[in-house]
Regions:
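An N-terminal boundary/leader segment
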Residues: 1-50, 286-288, 344, 348-349, ...
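Short helix-loop capping/hinge segments that flank enzyme active sites or metal/cofactor-binding pockets
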Residues: 64-89, 250-262, 311-370, 420-433
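Residue-level signal for inorganic ion chemistry
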Residues: 29, 51, 220, 258, ...
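Acidic/His- and Gly-rich active-site-bordering loop/insert found
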Residues: 51-133
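Short glycine/serine-rich loop segments
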Residues: 99-231, 415-436
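Acyltransferase
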Residues: 19-27, 56, 101, 244-247, ...
Length: 471
């Protein structure tokens, strides 16, 4: 197929106008999943019969009524559906969610028909989707390469045209990295924009959030309206927008002061990733923005990684406790992958005082980082330091962790600071693999990023660029 499939906004319009039915669109999407998934391994839990029943019934009259959708199998719990989190012990025990998350209720109320749940690395702990429990997801642009992670199953599904948009989540880059590696739009919202409830209040000391991967800025903006909102007991609440995010698409962002950070002396960044950022800088100048080489002094603080890893390690140890409760016995070393067992073991050795010290450190560091936006509007950087790596490169038991640390240098900072950041598909490598560019805005100002992203989408459209495995 050489013609791009409609985005979710267009599909919703077709349904409302009577030019298509939800049953037709859901059947078409299921056919694509069944035909393509043997190549990319994106969908690990199917609910096709339930989806067909929902499509034929009375759907909520939301903005995406009847549009097919997929949900990442990490969080976004769906009552009665599997929730394996990429883990074999949860898979083998047949663990299912007891109740819908607030997020999934919002997705359902918007009218989406969910076809299934997508592949994710175990516990979302890395930026490639190669769980031992379900096998690797493969990049539709080149099946020998990674989709990124941890939302790699969702990204592969959207890139291949199975559905126009899919749920994703991000604790250190897990929306932006798969979006970068699969040629999609991937917005990480501000902290407190989307509720984790009722199952949780926060993740990784406030670093995690949900979102989507999509093929258009307008889909991403409209979906942020769907997913946003506070619920009783939420520990963080983002400042509400002045108008719907969907209304920001097409609005002139004005002349922005933009800092460009194509590389850093302490980070070995692939020249093609550097070139992607430099090309984005040139395009921004052509659009009338003020662009200069600049970045926050705190961006590459040498202490950051140590404190972030401490927080993630403790959270992993807590995951083990919760997983044990779900399967009815303690989690042992044979129940999880080696890298996660190591991370959880580190977490178990961290004292309460040391954990609180790390949380306090990242809070103080975040204030230093965010101060840069007092003088600038947007920071532009690589998403990840290499183009999409081969399958197995990051999951290698001997070198995977070292490689992960070396390339994941540009995204976790904004999980910790809580700022919105988006990956846009503006560049392709000489080998034909997507390389996204990251744009970071001030806290709670997704609206600014949406205006800028839509301007860039118009100036350098990507919708017609399709992978070899598509539709």
């Amino acid at each position: 197929m050489t013609t791009p499939l409609p985005d979710a906004t267009e599909l919703a319009t077709l349904i409302r106008s009577g030019q298509a039915s939800s049953v037709e669109l859901v059947d078409d999407a299921i056919e694509r999943v069944q035909r393509l998934d043997s190549s990319i391994n994106a969908v690990i839990h199917e609910r096709f019969d339930a989806a067909r029943t929902e499509a034929a019934g009375e759907l909520p009259d939301g903005p995406f009524r009847g549009v097919p959708f997929l949900v990442k199998d990490l969080g976004c719990e769906m009552a009665g559906e599997p929730h394996s989190m990429g883990n074999r012990a949860l898979r083998d025990a047949g663990v299912r969610a007891e109740q819908d998350s607030y997020l999934y209720r919002s997705i359902s109320n918007a009218g989406f028909v969910t076809l299934g749940r997508t592949n994710t690395p175990e516990l979302g702990g890395t930026v490639t989707t190669e769980p031992e429990a379900f096998g690797p997801s493969r990049n539709p642009w080149n099946l020998d390469h990674s989709t990124g992670g941890s939302s790699g199953g969702s990204a592969a599904a959207v890139a291949a045209g199975m559905v126009p948009m899919a749920h994703a989540s991000d604790g250190g880059g897990s929306i932006r990295v798969p979006a970068s590696e699969c040629g999609l739009v991937g917005l990480k919202p501000s902290r407190g924009r989307i509720s984790h409830g009722p199952q949780a209040g926060e993740g990784w000391a406030g670093a995690t959030t949900d979102g989507v991967v999509s093929r258009s800025v307008r889909d991403t903006a409209a979906m942020l309206d769907v997913m946003s909102g506070r619920h009783t007991g939420d520990p963080y609440v983002a400042a509400p927008p002045t108008r719907p995010f969907a209304d920001e698409v097409g609005v002139d962002p004005g002349r922005l002061r933009i800092g460009l950070a194509p590389s850093h002396a302490g980070v070995q960044t692939d020249p093609e990733c550097v070139a992607a950022v430099e090309a984005a800088g040139s395009l921004l100048e052509q659009l009338g923005h003020d662009v200069e080489i600049a970045q926050p002094d705190a961006f590459f603080d040498e202490e950051f990684s140590r404190h972030f890893v401490t927080i993630v390690a403790v959270a992993t140890a807590v995951d083990f406790v919760n997983m044990g409760a779900a399967i009815g016995r303690p989690i042992g070393e044979g129940d999880v992958e080696a890298s996660n067992w190591l991370m959880g073991s580190i977490g178990q050795s961290v004292s309460a005082a040391d954990y609180i010290a790390s949380v306090n450190w990242v809070h103080a560091w975040s204030r230093r980082l965010q101060a840069w936006w007092d003088d600038f509007d947007v920071l532009v950087s690589p998403v990840i330091a290499v183009p999409p790596p081969p399958i197995g490169w990051l999951s290698d038991p001997e070198h995977g962790t070292e490689r992960l640390t070396s390339i994941l240098q540009f995204t976790p900072q904004f999980n910790v600071s809580g700022q919105p950041a988006v990956s846009l598909p503006l560049h392709w490598s000489r080998a034909g693999l997507p390389i996204g560019v990251q744009f970071v805005g001030p806290i709670d100002d997704e609206a600014l990023l949406i205006r800028l992203a839509a301007q860039l989408e118009t100036a350098a459209p990507w919708a017609s660029r399709l992978p070899s495995v598509y539709g």
